[in-house]
């Protein structure tokens, strides 16, 4: 079950779901069978779940590489930033965000990008993603193997009041 109030944690996850998880692992938390599945291109699959989150999986390795909030998600980034807040409040709270004209999103080097509604000037979506998303070789799908080699999988993390288990390869 999705935790609509879980914190949004850059490079880690949100909604009680961890980045780098496999589809089968996420399916144990939330039924992907009931989610709207979209094949975005020959390498990406997206699941839209309960108007709360979008999950982006890489087709080559089956790993979750991006999670995006939708309208019904209530969790916060850095205990303050949330869907529906104004862009002015976003920038006031964290001045590291800058607007990327090409992508049309606010970005931060902290592993987040935020899409806004230009008519209301409010935060529409918040995305967290894996560090490798910006790598030139991201599409080859080999990025997750370094975590397996480095032995950092299969550990339990407690983040706030949310104990999340790092996914198994």
Regions of interest found by a model, annotated:
Residues 1-169:
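Short helix/turn-capping signatures at newly exposed starts of structured segments
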